[in-house]
Structures are given as structure tokens and as C-alpha cells.
Amino acid sequence: MIVILNNGGQYVHRIQRSLKYLDVPAKIVPNSTTLEEIAANPEIKGVILSGGPDITKATNCENIALNSELPVLGICLGHQLISKAYGGEVSRADSEEYASIKIYVKQENDLFKGVPSEFTAWASHMDEVKVTPDCFEVLAYSDICGVESIKHKEKSIYGVQFHPEVSHTEYGDIILKNFCKKCGFGFEE
């Protein structure tokens, strides 16, 4: 099972639905859920930190990003929380994104395996990662956001600023499937 920490984002149920379409069991839990509660459940194979409107109300997400031994994917606010937890800088975007945008993948990697180097994704945010932590690499960018996706250099921790769970995002199902593979789920190819 994948647990989705609910940070109050408008698309949190779409994350669960997208995983259901992949036949991956998922459960939405409050963002007050602790790392200890997650670690105590052997059915949980990965964690998704959802989007949301307020970084100050994302209770336990930074602790989970820093200390979880399970794979973690941050989406939108979740992506920003991961970066902030590791010493990155998050602030108001130069240009707010509420539209379909072009994403450019810098190089093939495990999160974007099977995804072309350029694709359209849905973005909906006012803040963004401005400085990436040293222990992360930038996987993708757009014309108006230099950090659309990141990966920890040693752990299975990923972040995407855009929304792979929204139907407007091309290859969003493949991106989510690739994360689920990192969590140990198998898929027939």
C-alpha cells in the first residue's frame, strides 16, 4: 500500500484514484500521521506527500521526508517540503503556474523512464523550489520553473512540482507507475 499524506490540496483524491487505476492500493491519511505510525504498518511500501495551500500546515511531512526508509514522492507542496527539509529554498514563484506547461526532462532517470524528454503537464502553484539542496539533483524543468522535479542522490526520494495525477499531464500514469516500482510493486509490461 502507498499512503498519501493529505496536505489539503485539491487533487489529493486524484492521486488515490490514479494509483487505483494502476491496481496499487492507496490510502489517504491526515498529514498529522507520524513516521512511527507509518513504519509500524508492514503493508505500507511508499509515501506520497500531496499538494496543498500552506507549507506551514504540513505537520509531519518534513520529518517523514528526512527519516523515512520507504520511498517518498512529493507532489507540488510535497515537492517543496522535501526540498525545504533538506535545506533547499522555497519562495514565491516569479510567475504563478495555473495551466498546462511544457516539462523538459534533463536526462533519463528512474522516475521518468519511458517518458519523452519533453511533455505537457498540469501545474497549479504560487511557490516553487528556488535553491535545490546539495544532496538532490534536478531531473526536470520548465520555461518558468527551473526545478520541476528532483531526486535525492542516494535515497528513493523524489519531488515533482507539477501534478502527475491530473489527466492534463501526459505520461502522469507512467511517472506514478515508476514511483510505485521503486516501492516494490510489479507491473506486467
From Swiss-Prot:
<feature type="domain" description="Glutamine amidotransferase type-1">
    <location>
        <begin position="1"/>
        <end position="189"/>
    </location>
</feature>
<keyword id="KW-0067">ATP-binding</keyword>
<dbReference type="InterPro" id="IPR023686">
    <property type="entry name" value="GMP_synthase_A"/>
</dbReference>
<comment type="subunit">
    <text>Heterodimer composed of a glutamine amidotransferase subunit (A) and a GMP-binding subunit (B).</text>
</comment>
<dbReference type="InterPro" id="IPR004739">
    <property type="entry name" value="GMP_synth_GATase"/>
</dbReference>
<feature type="active site" description="Nucleophile">
    <location>
        <position position="76"/>
    </location>
</feature>
<comment type="function">
    <text>Catalyzes the synthesis of GMP from XMP.</text>
</comment>
<dbReference type="GO" id="GO:0005829">
    <property type="term" value="C:cytosol"/>
</dbReference>
<keyword id="KW-0436">Ligase</keyword>
<dbReference type="GO" id="GO:0003921">
    <property type="term" value="F:GMP synthase activity"/>
</dbReference>
<dbReference type="InterPro" id="IPR017926">
    <property type="entry name" value="GATASE"/>
</dbReference>
<feature type="active site">
    <location>
        <position position="165"/>
    </location>
</feature>
<keyword id="KW-0547">Nucleotide-binding</keyword>
<comment type="pathway">
    <text>Purine metabolism; GMP biosynthesis; GMP from XMP (L-Gln route): step 1/1.</text>
</comment>
<keyword id="KW-0658">Purine biosynthesis</keyword>
<dbReference type="InterPro" id="IPR029062">
    <property type="entry name" value="Class_I_gatase-like"/>
</dbReference>
<dbReference type="GO" id="GO:0005524">
    <property type="term" value="F:ATP binding"/>
</dbReference>
<protein>
    <recommendedName>
        <fullName>GMP synthase [glutamine-hydrolyzing] subunit A</fullName>
        <ecNumber>6.3.5.2</ecNumber>
    </recommendedName>
</protein>
<keyword id="KW-0315">Glutamine amidotransferase</keyword>
<dbReference type="Pfam" id="PF00117">
    <property type="entry name" value="GATase"/>
</dbReference>
<keyword id="KW-0332">GMP biosynthesis</keyword>
<feature type="active site">
    <location>
        <position position="163"/>
    </location>
</feature>
